Each structure stands twice: as structure tokens, then as C-alpha cells.
């Protein structure tokens, strides 16, 4: 780097002016899109100043050496980029990194041609991941960078990699394309064929995190030098799409299997021959693979590392790893694997080194699976379902080089001694989290190299003397969290090298004798046991013990000789016991001890325990019962001391050790400390925790000499005042941070001694710490009747007060005399306050029992509180000379009289409180001298009269309270002369109802309604009757003989009962109408759910729209791909299975590869109701695509009604105008509505064929989609030997029960039946016969049904050759699924309800009455080849001919006329039916018997299907 810095030369300004700035991203040509992008970019917090600005001549050219010649050449990096020398190269080559917003998007136009081609060998492009804008790479974007060797493009939302994008990059070695489209599911990443045709020298290719769904054929074939490929975190579903399948091992033409080859297989076979690459590393983890097929990686002969972890793989073919001759590391972890084929590692037996299978569902483990893998070094089988049944002497045979074996988190209950017979090189064995209850003798004897044995979290109860025989080099043994109640004294006899022993979490009551004389032991963990007593010789012979953990036991005392045999002990943990007594000198025998934990015990005193321990550095004695502490109790070398949660009232330092101690951390929180001073804290302290104590006083200079101080916690104490000297420290150097103090949570008082605290963080002298929680500090106001507390930072100078009794200013010379106005003397029984400047002087005499004005009230009083006394009158000149008085409280003092001169001299009075007294009248001159008065409170007196002009002189009056008096004729309109009045209170008086007065009063009320705060309560009195003044209809004034009269309206009193009844009826009627309107939806739901008035509320079926009746589906659901689980598992599960709706789901049933608009409209038109699940995922993904919007527009134009299901939180700002319009005009149902299902059923049409087992009719949904069967089925046909082609049924399926360890794949070759009659054609019976197959065990009833299924398949295969053209296409590896699956078998015959009898004449009689399906004739469309004795399902029985022969163990079927027909109940539903059988009485789901997943049509109108079924049953 120094070499390059020396080469940087200044550039002449003339040269600078000749070059213009070039940026990768230039301004878009359309101003409208530019403004739109600025708005979006602004939200994302991205600056566009450099990306979007036009070129400017502000570039400084960067010189670069040109090689050996030494001539510098200029390297001109674009403004969006920065460069650095490429690592690991001697030549001055450049690695360029460009940070862009997007690449060629609607916001930016990107020009990569400005990147200098010379010296640029590495280019890294990073886009802004927060911007969801689609980027684009143009053809030949990097064609000029002919020397480029590394190209990395990340976070750019690319949708396609064209075939000419990489043109010109012939020298490219390393390519990384990570769009991270996986976070934007709506955007896929597609790669065109021949996209890598130019980059033939590519060695490393990373295409991870791109949301790739599929790949072109042989896309990687041109990369002959490729050694590493990363395809992780995509959406790939078929391993064969990678193009690494070895097709040379597939069957040739002319075989029987070729006749049943599916359309997908033909397409694969017709592609070019498989290419062979020299890949050494392949990562396809985090995809959606569910099957690992045979020969899937067969062409990768040199592959060493294969990672297929974190997929959904549930089945692995026998030859899945065929061709991988050099495979060393295989990672199949975090899948759904249940079993593994026996021959999985057949070709890698001599090369495989590491196998990772953890976090699967493996419950079956073939004993031959791992045998003789003599190069295997690591095997991880943890987190599976393996039981001891599958671990025997053959499981690990031949693993002579195995070093690591992980069997943790399984269900092992026992270990046989022969299991580990060949594992003599094993070093680490993990058996944690199993169910082992005992260990047999010599179980681990063969593993003489084992150094780590983990047996924790099992159910071991006792450790036998011979359980650990042979473990001579064992160094770590974990037996924690078992149920051990004892250990044999000789249990560790052969583990002489043991260094770390974990016995915690057991039920031991004493220290095991087996520990004695274990001279190599370094650590012993006996915590969380039940040990109550430790003998003096408990640790005899443990001379090298380093750490001892005894936490969480029941120890009560420690004797002097307990640890005498542990001279090298350094860490001792005795926490959480019941220790109350520790003998002095108990720890002195262990002179090297450095850390001791005694917290959580019952110690009262530690005097003499630790003072003579010079090596002690760390001591925790918290949560005990200590009442006293002195620094002399601990050694001076101690660095960390924890005393929190004790009962300490002080920190004593009798010997003055504050300068000698080396203590750095001290925790004394949660104690009872009341005072701290300089000697309470050592000078070496760095971290001090004093919070949650009772500290009231912090002495000055407490922290003065604590030069290493970094943090002090004083919060949650009882500090009320704090002197500035209490926090003073020595000056801190500029390069060091000031100490941090936390003092919040204290009951500070806003006195005059604490005002400095408000500004302490702004002091620049660096002699005071920083208060980190200053904003949280509140202080209590000493005298404030409006609020008790105030935030310290909001307090004003007038809030910081101090009390005084007497004070004499320096300029006052009469203080020695009695009559001295400049002397401040607080009256008796009063409290006086002042601020720092004495501008605020408060005299508080409230409730002092004065009967007359207190004498000697200070002349400079600014606020006087004399309320709550017993004055009869306020005499004249009572406040004479108090020229500074601004606030006067004389309320609630029984004042009856005030005089004209009472308030003389109070020119500065602002607030006067005289409420709650006994004042009778105001004569007019009482307030004339109060020209600056702002607020006057006279409420709750007995004022009956107020003279005119009483308030005339109060020009600045703003608040006047007169409510609660006895006023009758006061001319309130005179208050208009007070221009600043904003608040008047007049209620609760006895205002006159005389008409003349009342008119003027009302007029004033109308004009001053905003000022009079209680105008609604103002009323007048007439003949002891009260009336609100604003009431106009209740009274009326008339003039008769010049006298105003008040008349009640008695005319209507006789009509009151009638009016009351009419009013109630009116209110009830409109209440009923309003209730029906408000709850109309609930009433509709109730009527629908109870079928109440259904014939009246809804149209009769004969009035239903004929077009809707012809639609095959009840509803079509559109939703986001991210909400697929919610729709499939919750909505569809309930609507289809519980209610019987026929649904079409977008991502399940619609061909999403077709044009979205047409597919969506076609699917919606095939259903009676269109339902859209609106969520945040839909708004951000699908709705952002034009196709969805146009489809929804078209549906609305066709008057297609839309029902919205609102799922999750919907951000309002992200809902555009179109969606808002649809939401306003459509039915919306919220998922979290408690009546969601009722409302949804009300919004949907009645299901077709209600009451039947309705199949989902997807003819309208699947238009243009190729039907296929279950590609993930588990059966023999999915093997390399068959090439993915389903063979015809043969007799070899009948017997496979003899092979006890056969998988489904091996059933075909197995021989010897196990309780089955030879059924020549039943592959399903073969599957059921396998004892240890990968599928669930079948019941007898299921075996019987499967046998019947085999016969049906036989007849279907006979019809196969005649009607090959009518067969539906099938996936390349698809096989029939004969076992229970998630797909229901509709219209199944319930044989559990039939009465089946064995008959000597082979007559299958009295089968019972079958149920009719959908109310149609079940016999319609039946094949004519049935026996003439056949009775339709509506009849009473099936009678076979005398010549019939029985088929099956329980005579379920009859073969009549030499096999000419089979009696099977064939039910019909709609236009399609499945030949199925059920074994449960409640129509539970059972496998279909058809060879394919297609259904047999029984409609007479379909001639082709009718012919097919006749031939099928011929």
C-alpha cells in the first residue's frame, strides 16, 4: 500500500480541465420518471446527487504505475466507484467497486463503458437493496473489459441474464450474480441458453439468492474449467434441471419401460447428451428439492463437496450418488429424510470422509448403510428419530477412520457393547439428549482413542465400575443433567487421563469417592446436586484441580480442612448454597486461588476469611446477610468485589487503605448505605455501583482523587440536594473521556443549591463528570400550588428556592434595631423562601391560625400566602410598603370586610385570591389601586351587591370569578369596559328574572359567550323557581300596566302523559330501524347460518343464473405466493373438506407459466365467485405487476363481483387509487373478524351438490396445463434401473416380505411373502409387505384394500396397449401413490359399513346399500361387461355367478366368467369419478386405485371415455 501511495502524483490543472466527469448512472431522459424516482429514493433514504447528476468537470485523475517501466498511467474511476490495488498480484492491477442505486431501471440509465479497460481485472457492482426496482443488463455491457477476471453483481434486482450480456469477457474466471430476488418473490431470475457460452474459462460461478425456478438445458456444459458452483437459496425443484444427470445408465429403446415413458422423460431424452464437468464444489442448499433422483449428479466425476442441506428432500433413490467417484463431503442436513437407501454410498465407500445428516426425520437406519466406509472421518446423525432398534453391531462396522460421531438428540435407550467394535480411532462421541438409562460394561472399550464423551441430558441413574472401561485417553466426560444418584468408587479407574468432569444437574448427595486420586483432573462440576456435607478428604489426590463448581447444592458450612488437598485450585464456586459459617483460614490452604463465588448464601460476617489470600482477584459475596464491611477484610490485591444485595449501612475504612487498594470494580448496590465520602471508595476504582441504596448525603470531594473513574451509578437513592463540590474531580486530560454519572431516580428538591446541576454538562473546565441521565431527573418544587414536580432541565431560576429565618443585606445598616424595613425576618409560624438573587421572596403563612395580619412581613415579599387563617377583616393599609408583592392568597380565611385602603400600595399585584370567604358586598373602591391586577378570584363568598364601577379601574384584568355568590342585579354588561377579560364566571348566583334586566343580561351573554365559561349554568330566580337564562320557550315576559310578569306555561301540562307516550313510541320505532340498519350484516349472517327464512331471503334454485350453474367451481382464490400456506392449509382446508366447496386456487391449480392475465381471467370465469386475499405481500409483489391489474380491470368491466379477504396489517400509504376503488365498491371481510367464517359463507354461493363429497373440479383452472401425477411418490419405479419409467405389473411384486431391511426400492427384488397371497400385479401389496420400508406400516384393513387396488391396476394395464393415445402424460419420475397422502380420495365406497361374508359358493352377498352420490343414478354409465347379476348401488346386494372365483383374503371381489369381470362399487360424482376404496366409516382419505392420478369419466356423453371404460372392464 505504501508503494502505491508514493506513486500518487498531483495532476496539472490543465489536464484536469481536459477531462470531464463520467458517471455510471446518468439522468433519465423523461422528467416525469425522474421526479417519480426522486420521490421513491427519498423514502428509501438514498442520495441521488452523484448517481443522477449530469457530468461535471470536477474529477481528479488518479495516477497508476504501468508496470516495470515505471511510467505512470492515469486510472480514471467513475464517480460512483472507488478502486484499490488487486490483492495478491505483483502487477499494478485494479479492483473496482461501484455503489449504484439500480442498473438500467426506470430510475437510472447505466453506462459501463466509462470504466477504464486497462488494469481493471476485478469489478464489484453493489445496488441499493432497499429499492424494489427492476434492473436490467444490456447486451455487451462489459465487452470492452477484455482483461476482467472477476465480476460480482449483488443486490441488483435483475430479471434476466441475456446470452450477449457477458460477451467480451473471455478472461473471466470468477462470476458472482446475487440479485437477492428471494426477498422479492414476484421477481424471478431467468438465464437464457448459451448465456455462458463466451465465458468458457470460468472457474467459480455463484448464482445464489436469485429466486431461480428453472434452468435451460445443459446451461453449464460450456464451462469446461468450472470447479465451484453455488446455486443455493433459489427455488429449484428438480435436481435434473442442473443438467448433471448421467443418462448413459438409463434403459435403451425397446424395453418394456419405454412404452410408459412420460412426456417429461421424452423431452429430457431428446435433449443433448449430458455434459461432463470437472466440478469440485457444488452447493444447492436452501432450494425446494423434494427428491434426490438416481444419477442426478452422475456426470460430476471429480466432485468433492456436495451440499444439499436445507431443502425439503423426503426421498433418496438408491443410486442418488452414482457417478460421484471422488465425493468426500456430503451435507444432507435439515431436510425431511425418513430413511436412506442401503447402497447410497456404494461408489464412495473408499473415498467419502464427512457425512452430515443432522436435523432430519430419520427413523430407519439400515445396518449396511455406513458399513465399510473406511475413509469416513465425521458422521453427524443428530436431531433425528433414531431408536436403539436401528443401532446394532453392523451399523458402524468398518468405520476404522471415524473421528467424530454425533448421535445427540435422538431416541436411543441402550447401547450394546458390539456397536463401537470397529471405532478404535474415534475421538469425539456425542450422545447428549437421548434416553439412555444405563451403560453396560465395556461399552466404550474398543474406543481407546476417545478423548471426548458427551452423555449429558440422558436418564442415567448409576455409573457402574466397568461402564467406562478402556477409555485410557479420555479427557472430557460430560454426565450432567442425568438422574445419577451414585457413582461407583472405581467408575473412573481406567480414565486416568480425565481432565474435565461434568456431574452437575444430578441427584448426588455426597462428593463421589471415585474422584479421589484423579491426579490429572483440571475441572470438576458438581453443581445443581443435593450435596449437604463435604468430608475433609473428599478431594484427596486432586493436586492439579484448577476449577471446582459446587453451585446450587445444600452446603451449610465450610471447615478449615475442606480444600486443603487442592493446592492449585484457582476458581471456586460455592454460590447458591446455604452456607452460614466459614471457618477462618478455610481458603488459606489454597494459596493460588484467584476467584471465589459465595453469593446467594447466608453469611453474616467475612472478617478473617480473605485477608490472607494474596492471589485473590475476584470475589463475589453478594446476596448474603452482611451488616458490616471494612476494606481490611479483603486483600489489597483484589480487583473485583461484588457486595450487592446485603444489609450494609456503611463502607468502613478504619485502616485508611483507600490509596493502597487496587480495587477496580465495586458493586454495593441494593444495600442500606446512607452516606458516602472520600474514604468510602478506593482511589483505584473504575466502576462504582451505588444504586438502590438509602444514600442522602454525598460529601464534598468524594470523587476527587479517583483518577481512573469511568462510571458511577447513584440512581434510585434518597438524595434531595447535592452540592457541586460533591461531584468535583481532578481535571481530566483531553484525550480521555469524562466519567459518566447516573443520578436519576432521586427525590431532588429544587432548592437554590442545585441550580448548577441543570448546566453541569456544559461546564468546560473538565473537572466535573457528564450526567448521562440528566433528562430523566425530576425535582420537587418547594412552593408551587400548580405542580409538585418539574423536570430539572425545564426548571426556571424562580423555581430554585431556599428557606430563611432572618436575613440582612450588606447595605442595610439598621438590622440591629427593631424597626428596620431592610431586614428580612420570617413571621412566626411561617416559612419563607428566596432564590439566589432574592428577586423572589415568598412568605408562606397558610393555616398558621392567625386572627389578624401577621406582623413584620418582609417588605420585599413577592408572594404572600395567608390563606386558611381566621381573619374577620382585612384592615386598611394591611400591606402598606409591600411594593413588590405580586401574588396574594387571602382565601378561606373568614374575611367578611375589606376596605378602600386594604390594598393600598400594591401597584405590582397581579393575582388576588379572596374566594371562600364571607364578603357581603363591594362598595366600589376596594380595588382602585390595583391597576396591574390580572386575576381576581371572588367566588364562593356571600356577595349580594357590587357597586357600579367596582372593576372599572382594573383595565388589565383578565380573569374574574364571581360564581357562587348571591348576586341579583349586578350590571354584568359593565364588564365590557375591561378590554382584556378572557375568563368570566357568573353561575350559581340569584340573578333576577325581571324582564328589563333579563333582556340586557341575555344580550351580554350572547355577546360574551366565549368569555363566560359557565354560561350554560347561569340562571335566574323568580318565586323560588329557577330558570336558565338562555331558556326561551319555558317562560315569557309580558307588560301589563307597566309591570313585567313571569308566567309558567301551564297550558301543556295536561298533555304531558300523551306527549310522553308518543315520544317513547317514536324513539322506540326509530331505535328499531337504526338497530336493524347497524346490525344488518349480523342479521344476515345469523339467517344464513341457521337457514332461517332461507326460502324468503334468497332466490329459489330455479331462479339461479343458468351461467353460474354451468361453472364447474364455486370460487376462484387469487393470493400472494407468500400467503400460500394460509390459503391452502386454513381457507381451502375448511371450505373444501368441511363445507364441500369446489375451489380453484391460483398457485395450486392455475398454470402460472401461462400469460398471467389470460390465466387469471379464465380461472375467474370458471368460478361463480372471485375471491382475492389481500395482504401486504400481495400489494408488494403480485399487485405491482401490470398483468394482475389488467386482469382485475377486465373482471370488473365484465361485472364480475369480487370478494376481498383482508389478511394481516395493510399499510394505507401503499394502497393505490385503483385498489382503494375496488375496496370501496366490493365486499371486504377481515381475517381477524370473529365472524369471519359466517361472513365468508354468506359472500360465497351455495356449494354445488351440497351434502356430498365434492371433488375439486379444475377443468376451468387447468386449461393449458399438462396433467401430471405425484412426482414425489416413493416406490420402486423411481430408480435408475428403470430410468424413471413405470414398468408393467409383474409377479415379482407379490413377495418382498422376507427382506427385513428392504426399502420400497428393494421390494421388487425381494422374495418370500409375509402373510400375503401371491397377487401377480399388485405393486402396492409389495409395498405393504416390506417390513422396514420407508412408508408407514399398513393395517390389515389397508393391506386388504391395497390388494383390491392391485387387481384394478391389472385390468387397467390390460387396456393400456389398446388406448395408449388416450393416456394422460406423466412426470418422468412419477409413480402411483398407494399410501395415504394429502389428496383426498373422493366418492369412495365405505366398506367398513358393509357386512361381508365368506361363502362356499363364492357369492359376495349382502354388501348392503351403497350411498347415492349427488342425487344421481349411480348406475348410469356402468360398463356393460359387468356380471348380469350386478345390482346397482341402490340395490340390496351383489350376487356373483356360480362360476365366480374369489379374489382377496376377505372375498371383497368376485372374478366372474373366468376373470371376465370384477364386481366393484363405482360411485359417481359430477362428471368424473375415481375407482377408489375406503377403510373407514367416516369417509377418511385413502389412496386412489387408478394407475395414474387421472379420474375415469363415467359420462355417457363422452364417447371416447365411455369406450375406454368398457375396454378397461372387459
Curated annotation (Swiss-Prot):
Annotated function? Toll-related receptor which binds to the neurotrophin spz5. Functions in olfactory circuit assembly by promoting synaptic partner matching between olfactory receptor neurons (ORN) axons and projection neurons (PN) dendrites partners in the antennal lobe. Involved in the targeting of specific classes of PN dendrites (Va1d, Va1v, DC3 and DA1). Functions with Toll-7 to regulate motor axon targeting and neuronal survival in the central nervous system (CNS).
The gene name on file is: Toll-6
Which GO biological process annotations does it have?
axis elongation; convergent extension; dendrite guidance; regulation of synaptic plasticity; signal transduction
**Of which family is this protein a member?**
Belongs to the Toll-like receptor family.
- Disrupted-gene phenotype: Viable. Dorsomedial or dorsolateral mistargeting of VA1d ORN axons. No effect on the immune response to septic injury using a mixture of Gram-positive and Gram-negative bacteria; adult flies are able induce expression of antibacterial peptide genes (Drs, AttA, DptA and Mtk) and mount a proper innate immune response.
Locate the transmembrane regions by residue number: 1058-1078
Q: Which UniProt keywords apply?
A: Cell membrane, Developmental protein, Disulfide bond, Glycoprotein, Leucine-rich repeat, Membrane, NAD, Receptor, Repeat, Signal, Transmembrane, Transmembrane helix
User: Which stretches make up the TIR domain?
Assistant: 1111-1244
Q: Kindly give the PANTHER family that the UniProt entry links to this protein.
A: IG(IMMUNOGLOBULIN) AND LRR(LEUCINE RICH REPEAT) DOMAINS (PTHR24366), LEUCINE RICH REPEAT CONTAINING 53 (PTHR24366:SF96)
Compartments, as annotated in UniProt: Cell membrane
* Recorded topology in the membrane: Single-pass type I membrane protein
Protein's UniProt name: Toll-like receptor 6
Q: Which GO terms describe its molecular function?
A: heparin binding; NAD+ nucleosidase activity, cyclic ADP-ribose generating; neurotrophin receptor activity; Roundabout binding
Which species is the source of this protein?
Answer: Drosophila melanogaster (Fruit fly)
* Chief localization: membrane
Query: Cytoplasmic side of the membrane: what ranges?
Result: 1079-1514
Amino acid at each position: 500500500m505504501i508503494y502505491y501511495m508514493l506513486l500518487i502524483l498531483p495532476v496539472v490543472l490543465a489536464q484536469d480541465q481536459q477531462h470531464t466527469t463520467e458517471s455510471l448512472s446518468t439522468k433519465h431522459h423523461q422528467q416525469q420518471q425522474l421526479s417519480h424516482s426522486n420521490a421513491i429514493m427519498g423514502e428509501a433514504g438514498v442520495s441521488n446527487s452523484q448517481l443522477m447528476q449530469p457530468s461535471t468537470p470536477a474529477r481528479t485523475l488518479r495516477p497508476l504505475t504501468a508496470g516495470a517501466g515505471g511510467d505512470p498511467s492515469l486510472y480514471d474511476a467513475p464517480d460512483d466507484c472507488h478502486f484499490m490495488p488487486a490483492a495478491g498480484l505483483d502487477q499494478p492491477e485494479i479492483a473496482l467497486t461501484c455503489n449504484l442505486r439500480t442498473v438500467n431501471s426506470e430510475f437510472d440509465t447505466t453506462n459501463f463503458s466509462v470504466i477504464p479497460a486497462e488494469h481493471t481485472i476485478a469489478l464489484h457492482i453493489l445496488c441499493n437493496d432497499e429499492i424494489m426496482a427492476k434492473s436490467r443488463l444490456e447486451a455487451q455491457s462489459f465487452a470492452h473489459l477484455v482483461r476482467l477476471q472477476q465480476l460480482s453483481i449483488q443486490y441488483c434486482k435483475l430479471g434476466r441474464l441475456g446470452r450477449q450480456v457477458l460477451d467480451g469477457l473471455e478472461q473471466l474466471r470468477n462470476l458472482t450474480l446475487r440479485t437477492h430476488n428471494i426477498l422479492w418473490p414476484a421477481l424471478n431470475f431467468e438465464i437464457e441458453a448459451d448465456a455462458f457460452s463466451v465465458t468458457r474459462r470460468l472457474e467459480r460461478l455463484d448464482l445464489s439468492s436469485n429466486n431461480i425456478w428453472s434452468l435451460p438445458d445443459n446451461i453449464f456444459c460450456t464451462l469446461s474449467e468450472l470447479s465451484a458452483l453455488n446455486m443455493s437459496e433459489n427455488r429449484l425443484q428438480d435436481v435434473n434441471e442442473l443438467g448433471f444427470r448421467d443418462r448413459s445408465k438409463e434403459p435403451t429403446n425397446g424395453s418394456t419401460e419405454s412404452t410408459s415413458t412420460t412426456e417429461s422423460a421424452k423431452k429430457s431424452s431428446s435433449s443433448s447428451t449430458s455434459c461432463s464437468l470437472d466440478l469440485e464444489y457444488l452447493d444447492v442448499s436452501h432450494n425446494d428439492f423434494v427428491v434426490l433422483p438416481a444419477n442426478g449428479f452422475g456426470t460430476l466425476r471429480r466432485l468433492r463437496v456436495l451440499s444439499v442441506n436445507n431443502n425439503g428432500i423426503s426421498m433418496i433413490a438408491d443410486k442418488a450418488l452414482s457417478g460421484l467417484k471422488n465425493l468426500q463431503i456430503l451435507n444432507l442436513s435439515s431436510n425431511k429424510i425418513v430413511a436412506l437407501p442401503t447402497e447410497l454410498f456404494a461408489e464412495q465407500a473408499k473415498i467419502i470422509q464427512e457425512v452430515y445428516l443432522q436435523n432430519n426425520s430419520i427413523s430407519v437406519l439400515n445396518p449396511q448403510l455406513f458399513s465399510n466406509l473406511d475413509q469416513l472421518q465425521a458422521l453427524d446423525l443428530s436431531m433425528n428419530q433414531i431408536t436403539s432398534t436401528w443401532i446394532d453391531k453392523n451399523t458402524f462396522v468398518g468405520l476404522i477412520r471415524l473421528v467424530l460421531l454425533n448421535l445427540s438428540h435422538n431416541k436411543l435407550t441402550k447401547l450394546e457393547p458390539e456397536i463401537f467394535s470397529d471405532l478404535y480411532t474415534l475421538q469425539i462421541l456425542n450422545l447428549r439428549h437421548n434416553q439412555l438409562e444405563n451403560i453396560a460394561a465395556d461399552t466404550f472399550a474398543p474406543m481407546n482413542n476417545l478423548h471426548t464423551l458427551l452423555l449429558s441430558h440422558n436418564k442415567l441413574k448409576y455409573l457402574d465400575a466397568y461402564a467406562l472401561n478402556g477409555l485410557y485417553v479420555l479427557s472430557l466426560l460430560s454426565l450432567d443433567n442425568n438422574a445419577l444418584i451414585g457413582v461407583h468408587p472405581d467408575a473412573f479407574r481406567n480414565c486416568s487421563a480425565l481432565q474435565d468432569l461434568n456431574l452437575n444437574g444430578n441427584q448426588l448427595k455426597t462428593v463421589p469417592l471415585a474422584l479421589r486420586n484423579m491426579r490429572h483432573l483440571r475441572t470438576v462440576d458438581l453443581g445443581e446436586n443435593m450435596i449437604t456435607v463435604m468430608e475433609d478428604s473428599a478431594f484427596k489426590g486432586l493436586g492439579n484441580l484448577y476449577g471446582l463448581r459446587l453451585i446450587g447444592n445444600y452446603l451449610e458450612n465450610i471447615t478449615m480442612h475442606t480444600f486443603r488437598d487442592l493446592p492449585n485450585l484457582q476458581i471456586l464456586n460455592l454460590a447458591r448454597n446455604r452456607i452460614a459459617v466459614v471457618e477462618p483460614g478455610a481458603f488459606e490452604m489454597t494459596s493460588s486461588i484467584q476467584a471465589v463465588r459465595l453469593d446467594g448464601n447466608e453469611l453474616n460476617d467475612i472478617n478473617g476469611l480473605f485477608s490472607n489470600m494474596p492471589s485473590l482477584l475476584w470475589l463475589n459475596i453478594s446476596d448474603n446477610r452482611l451488616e458490616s464491611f471494612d476494606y481490611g477484610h479483603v486483600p489489597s490485591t483484589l480487583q473485583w468485589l461484588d457486595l450487592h444485595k446485603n444489609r450494609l449501612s456503611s463502607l468502613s475504612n478504619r485502616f485508611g487503605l483507600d490509596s493502597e487498594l487496587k480495587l477496580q470494580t465495586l458493586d454495593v448496590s441494593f444495600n442500606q448505605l446512607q452516606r458516602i465520602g472520600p474514604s468510602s471508595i478506593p482511589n483505584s476504582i473504575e466502576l462504582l455501583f451505588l444504586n438502590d441504596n438509602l444514600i442522602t448525603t454525598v460529601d464534598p470531594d468524594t470523587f476527587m482523587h479517583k483518577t481512573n473513574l469511568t462510571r458511577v451509578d447513584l440512581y434510585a437513592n434518597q438524595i434531595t440536594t447535592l452540592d457541586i463540590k460533591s461531584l468535583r474531580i481532578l481535571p481530566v486530560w483531553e484525550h480521555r473521556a469524562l466519567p459518566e454519572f447516573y443520578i436519576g431516580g432521586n427525590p431532588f428538591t429544587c432548592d437554590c443549591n442545585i441550580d448548577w446541576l441543570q448546566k453541569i454538562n456544559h461546564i468546560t473546565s473538565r473537572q466535573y463528570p457528564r450526567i448521562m441521565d440528566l433528562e430523566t431527573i425530576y425535582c420537587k418544587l418547594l412552593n408551587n400550588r400548580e405542580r409538585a414536580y418539574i423536570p430539572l432541565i425545564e426548571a426556571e431560576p424562580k423555581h430554585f428556592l431556599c428557606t430563611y429565618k432572618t436575613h440582612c443585606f450588606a447595605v442595610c445598616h439598621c438590622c440591629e434595631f427593631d424597626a428596620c424595613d431592610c431586614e428580612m425576618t420570617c413571621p412566626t409560624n411561617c416559612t419563607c423562601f428566596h432564590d439566589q438573587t432574592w428577586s423572589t421572596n415568598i412568605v408562606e403563612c397558610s393555616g398558621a391560625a392567625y386572627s389578624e395580619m401577621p406582623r413584620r412581613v418582609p417588605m420585599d415579599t413577592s408572594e404572600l400566602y395567608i390563606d386558611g387563617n381566621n381573619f374577620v377583616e382585612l384592615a386598611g393599609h394591611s400591606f402598606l410598603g409591600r411594593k413588590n408583592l405580586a401574588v396574594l392568597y387571602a382565601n378561606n380565611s373568614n374575611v367578611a370586610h375589606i376596605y378602600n385602603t386594604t390594598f393600598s400600595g400594591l401597584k405590582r399585584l397581579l393575582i388576588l385570591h379572596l374566594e371562600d370567604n364571607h364578603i357581603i358586598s363591594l362598595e366600589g373602591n376596594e380595588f382602585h389601586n390595583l391597576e396591574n391586577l390580572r386575576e381576581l378570584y371572588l367566588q364562593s363568598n356571600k356577595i349580594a351587591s357590587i357597586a357600579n364601577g367596582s372593576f372599572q379601574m382594573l383595565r388589565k384584568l383578565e380573569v374574574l370569578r364571581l360564581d357562587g355568590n348571591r348576586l341579583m342585579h349586578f350590571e354584568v354588561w359593565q364588564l365590557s369596559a375591561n378590554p382584556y377579560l378572557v375568563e368570566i364566571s357568573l353561575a350559581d348566583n340569584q340573578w333576577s328574572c325581571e324582564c328589563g334586566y333579563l333582556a340586557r343580561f341575555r344580550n351580554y351573554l350572547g355577546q360574551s359567550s366565549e368569555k363566560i365559561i359557565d354560561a350554560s349554568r347561569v340562571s335566574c330566580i323568580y318565586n323560588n323557581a329557577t330558570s336558565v337564562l338562555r331558556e326561551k320557550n319555558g317562560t315569557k315576559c309580558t307588560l301589563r300596566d307597566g309591570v313585567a310578569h313571569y308566567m309558567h306555561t301551564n297550558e301543556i301540562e295536561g298533555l304531558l302523559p300523551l306527549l310522553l307516550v308518543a315520544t317513547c313510541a317514536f324513539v322506540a320505532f326509530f331505535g328499531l330501524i337504526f338497530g336493524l340498519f347497524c346490525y344488518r350484516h349480523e342479521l344476515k349472517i345469523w339467517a344464513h347460518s341457521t337457514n332461517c327464512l332461507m326460502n324468503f331471503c334468497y332466490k329459489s334454485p330455479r331462479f339461479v343464473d343458468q351461467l353460474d350453474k354451468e361453472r364447474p367451481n364455486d370460487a376462484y382464490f387469487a393470493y400472494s405466493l407468500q400467503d400460500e400456506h394460509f390459503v391452502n392449509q386454513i381457507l381451502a382446508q375448511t371450505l373444501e373438506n368441511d363445507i364441500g366447496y369446489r375451489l380453484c386456487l391460483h398457485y395450486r391449480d392455475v398454470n402460472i407459466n401461462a400469460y398471467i392475465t389470460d390465466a387469471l381471467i379464465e380461472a375467474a370465469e370458471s368460478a361463480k365467485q372471485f375471491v382475492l386475499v389481500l395482504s401486504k405481500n400481495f400489494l408488494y409483489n403480485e399487485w405491482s405487476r401490470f398483468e394482475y391489474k389488467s386482469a382485475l380491470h377486465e373482471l370488473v368491466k365484465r361485472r364480475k363481483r369480487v370478494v376481498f379477504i383482508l389478511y394481516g396489517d395493510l399499510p394505507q400509504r401503499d394502497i393505490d387509487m385503483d385498489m382503494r376503488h375496488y375496496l370501496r365498491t366490493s365486499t371486504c371481510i377481515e381475517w381477524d373478524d370473529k365472524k369471519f367464517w359466517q361472513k365468508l359463507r354468506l359472500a360465497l354461493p351455495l356449494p354445488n351438490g351440497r351434502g356430498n363429497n365434492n371433488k375439486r373440479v379444475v377443468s376451468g383452472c387447468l386449461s393449458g396445463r399438462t396433467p401430471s401425477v405425484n412426482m414425489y411418490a416413493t416406490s420402486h419405479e423411481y430408480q435408475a434401473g428403470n430410468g424413471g419409467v413405470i414398468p408393467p405389473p409383474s409377479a415379482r411384486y407379490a413377495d418382498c416380505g422376507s427382506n427385513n431391511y428392504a426399502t420400497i426400492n428393494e421390494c421388487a427384488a425381494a422374495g418370500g411373502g409375509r402373510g400375503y397371497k401371491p397377487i401377480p400385479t399388485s405393486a402396492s401389496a409389495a409395498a405393504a409387505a416390506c417390513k422396514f420400508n420407508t412408508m408407514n406400516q399398513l393395517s390389515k384393513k389397508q393391506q386388504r384394500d391395497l390388494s383390491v387396488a392391485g387387481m384394478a391396476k391389472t385390468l387397467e394395464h390390460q387396456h393400456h396397449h389398446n388406448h395408449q393415445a388416450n393416456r394422460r402424460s406423466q412426470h418422468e419420475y412419477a409413480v402411483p401413490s398407494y399410501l395415504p397422502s394429502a389428496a383426498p380420495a373422493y366418492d369412495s365406497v365405505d366398506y367398513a359399513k358393509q357386512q361381508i361374508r365368506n361363502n362356499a359358493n363364492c357369492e359376495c352377498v349382502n354388501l348392503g346399500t351403497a350411498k347415492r352420490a349427488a342425487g344421481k343414478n349411480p348406475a348410469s354409465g356402468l360398463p356393460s361387461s359387468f356380471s348380469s347379476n350386478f345390482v346397482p348401488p341402490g340395490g340390496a346386494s351383489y350376487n356373483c355367478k356360480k362360476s365366480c372365483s374369489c379374489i382377496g383374503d376377505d372375498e371383497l371381489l368376485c372374478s366372474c366368467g373366468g376373470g371376465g369381470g370384477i364386481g366393484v362399487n363405482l360411485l359417481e360424482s359430477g362428471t368424473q369419478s375415481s375407482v377408489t376404496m375406503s377403510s373407514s366409516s367416516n369417509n377418511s382419505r385413502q389412496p386412489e386405485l387408478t394407475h395414474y392420478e387421472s379420474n375415469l369419466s363415467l359420462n355417457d356423453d363422452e364417447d371416447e371415455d365411455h369406450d375406454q371404460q368398457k375396454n378397461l372392464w372387459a
